[in-house]
């Protein structure tokens, strides 16, 4: 079935503009007719940041920006899904066209700019699924014109605290001017301090401690990774997601669209994001949860992320090229890998190749 989608379904969707195709796929999931889940395998269940995930594969933020189809995504076989990025006020993002396919590279360049319907719309939709099972995280961001961007992140924590199973603080999108500056040590210290203070205050009121993850860029120098690791450890952050899209265009084959401005995702991001993942694992040690994102499009690439240091993995662009059967295909492949490797749980495979990946050189 996956092969059938790649030849027929993808051809049909790719006849549309990339953003139109995205809207059509959301509409398709809303029908409830697309269900391709894999059976639960206890060997894939992992406990991360106090949450029990049925399997380590998640849907990355960016697809379900406005919390329209979280449960439909879980039915595809994902162990968790992440909505957003959500900003306090609605914003339209950057002018169209702003999503570009690089088919030969199985990649996408986007410069969306946090287009979303805002807190109110997402809150209303998530409230309708309150009490349902399934781990749904909320990825929070800042409005482009915010005078105090950190206040926007704090507002996200407070608004969605009862509904989110975890939060992701997104300071690594390259499409909001100046946003990545929040990754600098002094700015990051203030950001994490205020966000975690809000989390702790909300947690005391309802006796629930929601994990907070930080999503970082793959274009950071080793010294910048040092600073992020130190600050995350010092402030007892719950985990780090590695990584967002890259500004690098190293090794691309596609002639069409390669020079478009924006962040690159998909297969070409795999090596870079995995190297940064491994380097961060070496810096934070064995206890801090890390989530690997970037170029995951098969059980093999998901397993490679885990062996490089990831507790969980996420994908998005792979779904564009491989179709809705991909999550179940990966989950089945990970089950087979656990048996093949002779371990009782997927977590036992983490860090097996961390040193090797951390030593690799990043392409310019």
From Swiss-Prot:
Cell compartment(s), UniProt: Cell membrane
Residue numbers binding substrate: 65, 110-114, 170, 175, 244-245
PROSITE patterns: DHODEHASE_1, DHODEHASE_2
Gene Ontology BP term (one): 'de novo' pyrimidine nucleobase biosynthetic process
Reactions this protein catalyses: (S)-dihydroorotate + a quinone = orotate + a quinol
Record pathway: Pyrimidine metabolism; UMP biosynthesis via de novo pathway; orotate from (S)-dihydroorotate (quinone route): step 1/1
Listed EC numbers: 1.3.5.2
Binding-site list for FMN: 61-65, 85, 139, 170, 215, 243, 266, 295, 316-317
Gene3D superfamilies: Aldolase class I
Catalytic residues of the enzyme: 173 (nucleophile)
One Pfam family in the UniProt entry: DHO_dh
Co-factor binding comment: Binds 1 FMN per subunit.
GO cellular component labels: cytoplasm; plasma membrane
Gene Ontology MF terms: dihydroorotate dehydrogenase (quinone) activity
Segments traversing the membrane: none
Broad class of enzyme this protein falls into: oxidoreductase
Topology relative to the membrane: Peripheral membrane protein
SUPFAM superfamilies: FMN-linked oxidoreductases
Cofactor: FMN
Protein role: Catalyzes the conversion of dihydroorotate to orotate with quinone as electron acceptor.
Subunit structure: Monomer.
Family note: Belongs to the dihydroorotate dehydrogenase family. Type 2 subfamily.
Record protein name field: Dihydroorotate dehydrogenase (quinone)
Species of provenance: Brucella anthropi (strain ATCC 49188 / DSM 6882 / CCUG 24695 / JCM 21032 / LMG 3331 / NBRC 15819 / NCTC 12168 / Alc 37) (Ochrobactrum anthropi)
Gene behind this protein: pyrD
